[in-house]
Amino acid sequence: MRMEWPALKAAVSGCTECALHAKRDKTVFGVGDENADWLFVGEGPGADEDAQGEPFVGQAGKLLDSMLAAIKLQRGTNVYIANVVKCRPPGNRNPEPGEALACEPYLDRQIDLLRPKLIVALGKVAAANLLATDASVASMRGKVHDYRGTPLIVTYHPAYLLRSLTDKAKAWADLCFAVRTMEGLQSGANAPRS
């Protein structure tokens, strides 16, 4: 898939590759700076995102915006936000493997076009799809993983953090680790490994 941004957005908008398209209100392509160094990847749109056509606009989105602000980032400025799937799974369930596979070329092309310096996988579904693993978030935290030559860090999904307040401190540690990793990448030093 060699499409540029406008053609890729149009392809996602017209996609019928899996059953999720049948009940969507809008596709949720992604949002942000198309030249961003930071890419945050979630699992899929919820009801608010389906209605607005933008990722992370509900309560989890408000928390993500606060998390970004805490590390001196903001949506749309050197940050791009995307999801593994571009249509809402019914009942906010996790995307099924076939659904994620149908959207994989779109996310891959977004990453190719962005060429981010760092990817942050938000939650197990994003990490599992980007890293082809079924490992737990807890076991993947605190390490720099590799996604086709791009450093990738795993943390908890903001929706999970809304339900599990005790893991917010761990997510903060992950964000601090991401900042240190990015600083190392920008200075040309090797990224920290733990």
Name every feature range the model reports, one short phrase each.
Residues 1-194:
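A polyanion-binding, active-site-adjacent surface
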